[in-house]
């Protein structure tokens, strides 16, 4: 059995021991329902209020502007569905990009198909970025919401969110950014650097627990709720709050965002070593941009190879990587990001390596030692399957 090399930090990260320790009292002793009026409930409510105040202080917002969610997917759903529905009397035109996470794209698909909204999906350049000029040309009198992710989960492109947000604000249009992949990977001062009205955050992307996220909602915006059953989270998100996970989220924010845990010389050097070596490999084409990109992410395609064969080959050698695409019933869907880059023939062959704080130079060299053979096997298996 080969040793395990984890190069999939954009998918999830291990829970940090200090974060786990901060969560433990909420699992063992302070386990009351924050909505209960008795002493155990009041203890839990005090912890919830303190966690919200800590998050707001760290992010640079008001506590009332922080809504705790079950993760990035719910935060995106609340931001997009809730805001579009709340503002539909003003207009039903929405703008997003062609390279959003499925948690965003599928919200826009639903609003378009089921609720009569018009959706403009902005193209991207060869580096996967949206042009501010394209956004400005897409504005209409009935545009009420723009949503563009801060950083792409598949290829690591960093969007010009501050400029996009400024363009929206100049027109009085609400701007949401999915910052799930951004936090922990790029320098952070406060939320104002996004020029956004709504910002999605997810704990397990920076050594926090799964099942915890938040949505910043700039006052006085009030999206319609998408969950019903109580007045929790200022009547914006029904359901008993997951207090241990919330405390873990806030602790991870405080420990790993400033300075960002992934934004280190070591990680950038390891990323650059991978980039230089993969660029020289036969059959590989890099698709992750080298400028304005996440410091830990390397993405490439192998035209003519099957993505599942590539991932299976890596896994057999103990290497945990990702296609960046949804996997269903043993087959990979084409990467929408690679399709948006105009590389249709290679959209099924994306491989993403995403590094983290425990990645080492030895890991990188071990991967590079076996990668050419894995690529060769994947190409040969594709040719064999096609009868060539």
Which sequence ranges carry the predicted segments?
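Pyridoxal 5′-phosphate
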Residues: 1-388
């Amino acid at each position: 059995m080969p040793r395990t090399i984890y190069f999939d930090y954009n998918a999830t990260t291990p829970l940090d021991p200090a974060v786990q320790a901060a969560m433990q009292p909420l699992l063992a002793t302070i386990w009351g329902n924050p909505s209960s009026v008795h002493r155990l409930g009041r203890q839990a409510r005090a912890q919830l209020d303190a966690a919200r105040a800590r998050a707001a202080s760290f992010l640079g917002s008001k506590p009332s502007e922080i809504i705790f969610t079950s993760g990035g997917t719910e935060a995106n759903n609340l931001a997009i569905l809730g805001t579009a529905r709340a503002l539909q009397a003003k207009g039903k035109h929405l703008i997003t990009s062609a390279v959003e996470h499925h948690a965003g794209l599928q919200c826009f698909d639903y609003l378009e198909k089921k609720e009569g909204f018009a959706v403009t999906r902005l193209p991207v350049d060869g580096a996967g970025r949206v042009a501010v000029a394209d956004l400005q040309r897409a504005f209409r009198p009935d545009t009420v919401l723009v949503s563009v992710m801060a950083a792409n989960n598949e290829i690591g492109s960093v969007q010009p969110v501050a400029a996009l947000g400024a363009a929206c604000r100049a027109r009085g249009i609400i701007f949401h950014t999915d910052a799930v992949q951004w936090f922990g990977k790029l320098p952070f001062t406060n939320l104002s650097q996004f020029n956004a009205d709504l910002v999605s955050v997810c704990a397990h992307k920076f050594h926090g627990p799964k099942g915890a996220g938040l949505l910043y909602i700039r006052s006085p915006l009030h999206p319609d709720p998408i969950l019903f059953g109580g007045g929790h989270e200022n009547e914006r998100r029904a359901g008993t709050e997951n207090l241990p996970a919330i405390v873990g989220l806030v602790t991870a924010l405080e420990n790993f965002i400033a300075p960002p845990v992934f934004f280190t010389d070591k990680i950038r050097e390891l990323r650059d070593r991978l980039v230089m070596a993969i660029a020289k490999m036969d059959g590989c084409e890099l698709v992750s941009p080298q400028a304005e990109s996440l410091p830990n992410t390397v993405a490439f395609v192998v035209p003519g190879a099957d993505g599942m064969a590539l991932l299976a080959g890596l896994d057999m050698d103990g290497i945990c990587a990702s296609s960046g695409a949804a996997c269903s019933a043993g087959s990979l869907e084409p990467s929408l990001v690679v399709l948006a880059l105009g590389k249709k023939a290679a959209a099924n062959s994306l491989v993403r390596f995403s590094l983290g704080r425990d990645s080492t130079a030895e890991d990188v060299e071990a991967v590079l030692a076996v990668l050419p053979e894995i690529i060769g096997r994947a190409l040969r298996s594709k040719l064999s399957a096609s009868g060539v």
